[in-house]
């Protein structure tokens, strides 16, 4: 009798697992379709209106109109690729931070990591006189700023046993400190440095060219491969640290390596496109509502979701009062702020 009951339970679990798998894969396919449509819409958006067929040809330089080839290859396509890399990287970073810290409110913006990177980059531009975001100097100082914040957050989480809500509050405090420090740097900057900093901190996807995408692409690609290789480790962490250790996972090393990689990704993105908030918070939560906490699907979903959200935000910024282009940082903050408050109050009610 017990054997029959056990078989029925196993069958129900198997059916439920298959149903969840089909649902998750279907969601990823739909999300990929939405991303493709957004890419085509973004490719078409602009003052130089062109049929979509000619724009697709322009990607490969095959359009009969040389202006189309020039506009697509030198303007619109680099902007789209920047949004895909930056959005995907931030979405993945948020997903991984939420996993290793076991905190649904964790992201590079809510924990102050992005603000630390912004301060580091501003320090390099103004105090050290690097002058621009080109080269490795600014990203290096952005990484130093972000990793400093991450180590403080990690110390509070592991050694002081601060609650998830306390970690977020600490992140808010750290963000305020670094924002104030960045403002002081701007105050003492000259006119050229100030205009560079202000325009850069607004967030701009159009300032990057093909030469700037290589470093960001490598960092995001390495992080994607590493995180997907450890997808089952993140799933084990959901059951608690003791369970993960019993399965042979070095939790301390996993947490530290992932924090460093998330900081590296955040610093590279910030140094190239400026401060982009809430993508790392919003994207994983939207995907999690559809696929659950299984990182086999949550990781690629967060990458696709982050890329889609940032590209949609950029499309909105470019078209809402065209030809004026609104700062993408402001748009993403408007998108993410309400969701952050919703998650915070929802968590408070549960507590």
State where each predicted segment sits.
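Alpha-helical transmembrane segments in inner-membrane proteins
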Residues: 1-351
